[in-house]
Amino acid sequence: MSTGFFGDIQKIKYEGPDSTNPLAFRYYQPDEIVLGKRMEDHLRFAVAYWHTFTWPGGDPFGGQTFLRPWFEDTMKAAKLKADVAFEFFSLLGAPYYCFHDADVRPEGKNFAENTKNLNEIVDYFAEKQAATGTKLLWGTANLFSNRRYMSGAATNPDPDVFAFAAATVKTCIDATQKLGGENYVLWGGREGYETLLNTDLKRELDQLGRFLNLVVEYKHKIGFKGTILIEPKPQEPTKHQYDYDVATVYGFLKKHGLENEVKVNIEQGHAILAGHSFEHELALANALGIFGSIDMNRNDYQSGWDTDQFPNNVPEMALAYYHVLAGGGFKTGGTNFDSKLRRQSLDPADLLIGHIGGMDCCARGLKAAAKMIEDKALSQPLADRYAGWESVEAQKLFRGEYSLDEIANWVESKDVNPQPKSGKQELLENVVNRYV
């Protein structure tokens, strides 16, 4: 039954590239076969509950601009928000959604009341999922908004805050499992520091390691089959965040023996904040064996902060999905639109239009990436560039069968005098442009 929030808007349909209807897909066709699999199953789109339904439209210089009928901290309002959310998922045809606990339940006066409220809304969500067919991609706990977390959650100097955060994560993993969630995400927005003057780095990193081990231990204890994901971000809200980027997270996981237990949820905007391209973080995660999922939202390249805008750059999406596909595609992860409307976009239809544009952009990127893979447009030049390493002698060199002395003798006796070869960057950039 319609809530009336979206007026008379009907389910969004595919109308093709020539359509000028803003409430129609031009490129996203869920059932189109790409590399032998349905487009929907490749992309695994999810809607972010927080930015889509809880963000009030504020910024550092002004308050709320969105007037939503569910903007009250009551269970009645939470259920109305859920009604609108699941209507939205159905209109959009989004197969998945994601949430923080604080997005979906009213704030209680203590941990017990928070848990009671969460359990009640989870039961309501379960009914909604059964009625609509929408599934949970991942759940997570908000361990950064409440003032108790102003000095961190896992890394807080107060052990009571650590304990409260750990207990909250336990309830959120339970909720995720009950709803059939395929992943559980940890984002350490306050796990970092503002100044080293009051920060014991070693202690805080050790606390974070203990916290993550607790999560993994609990996952196995209850038989949760989903993937535990860490979402890297270099800063904001803290000056320096401990899960800075993919490389930093991998080093942390390796130190704590968790590199085979935890993977990464990579956000495009966070990669940019860390001084990387999105495809760099994706390629590195593949190389390290920790790729899990993505948050698909871009930043304004001039503002210098996390603006969480919908993707609209097809060449960027093509390279991103190239690395996703080259790594074998999503297993339990997917494409979560951690994107929010601009604060002047007040109409309910704007929520749909933003997601439609993002989904079309991703669909175009996916198809371009798939064609590049089919044609070996990038993989063949890459294989040719490193072909020298396939020789018998080079393989022995790589496997460590020669000592440094033996290598030096070999170079001298063979009069090895290598000459550089072109990297063909311009050619490869032109090749990519042919596909997008």
UniProtKB/Swiss-Prot annotation:
Details of cofactor binding: Binds 2 magnesium ions per subunit.
UniProt cross-references to Gene3D superfamilies, sorted A to Z: Divalent-metal-dependent TIM barrel enzymes
UniProt-listed Pfam families: AP_endonuc_2
A single GO molecular function term of this UniProt record: magnesium ion binding
Keyword Cytoplasm: yes
Subcellular location per the Swiss-Prot or TrEMBL entry: Cytoplasm
Enzyme class name: isomerase
Protein EC: 5.3.1.5
Keywords in alphabetical order: Carbohydrate metabolism, Cytoplasm, Isomerase, Magnesium, Metal-binding, Xylose metabolism
Any Gene Ontology biological process: D-xylose metabolic process
Residue positions binding Mg(2+) 1: 231, 267, 295, 338
Cofactor(s) the protein needs: Mg(2+)
Domain of life: Bacteria
Reaction equations catalysed: alpha-D-xylose = alpha-D-xylulofuranose
Binding site for Mg(2+) 2: 267, 270, 306, 308
PROSITE patterns registered for this protein in UniProt: XYLOSE_ISOMERASE
Catalytic residues in the record: 100, 103
GO cellular component: cytoplasm
Subunit structure: Homotetramer.
Entry's family note: Belongs to the xylose isomerase family.
Name the UniProt record assigns to this protein: Xylose isomerase
Organism of provenance: Rhizobium etli (strain ATCC 51251 / DSM 11541 / JCM 21823 / NBRC 15573 / CFN 42)
